[in-house]
Every structure is written in C-alpha cells, then in structure tokens.
Amino acid sequence: MPSPFPGMDPYLEDDALWPAFHHQLVMCLYQILLPGLVDRYRARVYQRHYDAGDHTEHHEDYVEIRQRSDGRLVTLLDVVSPANKTAPAGREAYLATRRTAGAAGVNLVEIDLVLQGQPMLEYSRDGLPEWDYAVTVTRATQPKRYEIYTATLQKRLPRFRLPLAPDDRDTVVDLQTAFTRCYDQADFAGRIDYRREPPVSPKEGARRRLDEVLRVNKLGGMRGQTSAGYVDPPHQAIALAAYYLWLAKGRPHGRDREHWLRALEQLRGPAGER
C-alpha cells in the first residue's frame, strides 16, 4: 500500500523508523543511480558512525561516486537525518563528511527530508517559495552557488540533476521514485499507525500543510481507521456484526437484527462512498 502522502511521509521521522528508512532510501538511490552512470564511474555506499550523546551508536549511509580509472571521488550524495539537525554531535559528524569532500573539490548533493531541527546549510530564502523538503546541489566548479530543488508536504518529491565530472553531462535522479521504492520494499505501510499524531511538530507553514494532508486523508487520530490510515467500513461491519451475533447468541433476530442492519447500513455509507 502506498504512503498517503504525495511525497515525503513525516511519520518516518519516528526514532524507531528513521534508521531503517535512511538505510533503505540510500540503497534505493544507489540502485537508481547505477544505470545513469557512464562506464567511467562506479558508485559505493559508505557509512559514518558516531554517538549523538544519547548513548546510541548512529549509523548513516551515504553514496560516493568515483572515477573508475584512479578512484578519485567525484560526487558525494548524502541524506540528512533527524540527529544531524537536532544533536550537536550528529550535526558535526554530517558537516565533517561534507567539509572533507568539499576540500577535495567534490560535487555535493544533500537530500533533506527532515522537518524538525535546524537546516544544515545556511542561505537566504528571500524570493524563494516556501518548502518543507529540499535537495541542494553544490558543484565543485562553483562551490559558493547552490542549486535548490524543493517540495512541500503536499507535493511529490523533485527530480534533480546530479553532477559528475565537468566534461560529463549530469544524470537526472527522480527522488520520488526512490522514495516510493523504499517505502514499498521496507513495508512501511504495515509499520506505521496513522491513527496517531505524527512524531514531529513542524513550524507554522509546514504544520498547516501537514494538517491539510491529514485532513484530506482522514489521518492523525481520526476514529475508525485501519493502521494504514484509511476508513475501512467492511472490516468495521464485520466486527459489529460479530458483536451483535454474540449478544443474540446466534443469528440476529427481532430488535437485535434491526439494530445490526441499521448499523451496517450506516457503516456502508450512501451510494458512491463504498
């Protein structure tokens, strides 16, 4: 079952889900990247380790793209985690990876799908539309210039251009395709209880957009939902029918039957809502 969100799913920021999501997303990005790389490059998934001060060892995957001929690092693709944006040690670990690559004249691609915490990169948002999620590309040939691809909670995740060596054309990566594959392969639909509130408390603009998506999809604590977040009248009807069968100690009859039929019809809803 797909995510009820058109792009990134903020329920994945849950501490219990993010590590698996981060790993799976990076692996899906890696898989999608491979066909777009010309023969002169190879991609590998690496991992940084650190303790964010909560006595928990954090492991964060990222992708390095290197030239086959000499092994020189060309592009670093990294995914921001909640710990990077909320814990000093996590922030420093992420920025250290970025500084090392930047000093070596490497293209940098940052994927930030985290609502909470402070942005990793500081730049003016004047004249730019509001966004909740961003992919920021920094080319080695223009290290002071950012290419920013954005999305909100109400939009699909963007496609972005991933730079390689200056004499090679960019490869285009569809982040939404990677996310959808990640969500399906890891079966997050079966692991998220959309009846509860999301694990993040975003700022005003993002909160408004989040509330709108929850309202449209009838999520976030609405009564009578399945764990996947959708109203499921047939299953409710079965449960209610079983209840009345138990009350009647057999086949519903008389007033019990009338109550059962009325409740069943209410659960089914008017024609066209089934």
Regions found by a protein language model. Name each.
Residues 1-226:
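Gly/Pro/Ser/Thr-rich low-complexity, intrinsically disordered segments predominantly at protein N-termini
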Residues 224-274:
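Intrinsically disordered, low-complexity, basic-enriched segments
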